[in-house]
Curated annotation (Swiss-Prot):
Phosphoprotein keyword on record: no
InterPro entries given in the database record: Ribosomal_eL22, Ribosomal_eL22_sf
Protein name: Large ribosomal subunit protein eL22
UniProt KW keywords: Ribonucleoprotein, Ribosomal protein, RNA-binding
Origin: domain of life: Eukaryota
PANTHER family: 60S RIBOSOMAL PROTEIN L22, FI24544P1-RELATED
GO CC terms: ribonucleoprotein complex; ribosome
Organism: Tetrahymena thermophila (strain SB210)
GO molecular function terms listed in the Swiss-Prot or TrEMBL record: RNA binding; structural constituent of ribosome
GO process terms (BP): cytoplasmic translation
Family stated for the protein in its record: Belongs to the eukaryotic ribosomal protein eL22 family.
Pfam families attached to this UniProt entry: Ribosomal_L22e
Amino acid sequence: MSFRKKTKQVKKVNLGFKIDCSQPVEDKVILIGEFAEFLKSKIKVGGKLGNLGENITISNDDKKINVQSTIPFSKRYLKYLTKKYLKKQDLRNYLYVTSSDKNSYQLRYFNIQQDQAE
């Protein structure tokens, strides 16, 4: 009697996420290439850093970062890494991450109102 080993088949999923950094890039607060490299080095696949392989591709335009994945990938994890980058660059007090639609995030400035009367 021979025993066959059951293999798990991973679903092929095509996911695409975008991070719109247009406001901070126009103000030259964030370098988009540096942010893309940060994501490439910090995304974990299979519990290992930088193990992207062909499963996850990260590309950047002038003001946007595109993340394409063929394995299950959480949008929330992308938000976590974005917040981690902002904290590392000491920008967390000025910028926040918000969801603009189902597959994208946007970096925005906090609205700081100063009292002009004083």
